[in-house]
């Protein structure tokens, strides 16, 4: 089924999430429902706030949006975040939302830039 608009939430708003967020914010077929990062002053958090996008320091706030989110992008690189998201989707019965791993983001950013983009992750725990 074709979509007219993708409703996206992004977890991780630092060096990896910010370039992705910039692309997403400029896409007319994307609605950003929220951005999460532990650092409320992370570059992507400031960008989201400036563009009127909801921000939170609790990534589970985005998971709790439920099936309103089409794609939940996790660029934290933290395995515990991925596991918590998967567990929440299972427990809540959410079979709609797709969780996108940072490796897929790396591929997308690399394709857009025409070169391999290396991801940077400063936080090991969330």
Predicted segments — roles?
Residues 1-5, 60:
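A short, basic/flexible loop-to-alpha-helix module at the beginning of a structural domain
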Residues 4-22:
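Glycine-rich adenosine-cofactor-binding loop
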Residues 7, 31-34, 69-72:
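Short active-site oxyanion
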Residues 13, 33, 37, 74:
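Glycine- and other small-residue-rich loops at beta-strand/loop junctions that grip anionic moieties
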Residues 27-51:
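NAD(P)-binding Rossmann-fold cofactor-contacting core
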Residues 44, 79-126:
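Rossmann-fold NAD(P)-binding glycine/threonine-rich loop
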Residues 54-62, 99:
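Short acidic-hydrophobic, aromatic-tinged amphipathic segments that line or gate anion-handling sites
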Residues 61-84, 96:
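Rossmann-like NAD(P)-binding element
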């Amino acid at each position: 089924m074709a979509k007219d608009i993708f409703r996206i939430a992004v977890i991780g708003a630092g060096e990896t999430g910010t370039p992705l967020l910039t692309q997403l914010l400029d896409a007319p077929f994307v609605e950003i429902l929220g951005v999460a990062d532990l650092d409320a002053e992370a570059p992507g958090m400031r960008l989201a706030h400036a563009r009127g996008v909801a921000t939170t320091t609790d990534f589970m706030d985005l998971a709790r949006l439920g099936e309103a989110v089409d794609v939940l992008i996790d660029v934290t690189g933290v395995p515990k975040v991925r596991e918590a998201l998967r567990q929440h989707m299972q427990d809540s019965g959410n079979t709609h939302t797709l969780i996108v791993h940072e490796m897929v983001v790396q591929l997308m950013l690399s394709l857009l830039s025409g070169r391999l983009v290396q991801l940077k992750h400063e936080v090991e725990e969330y």
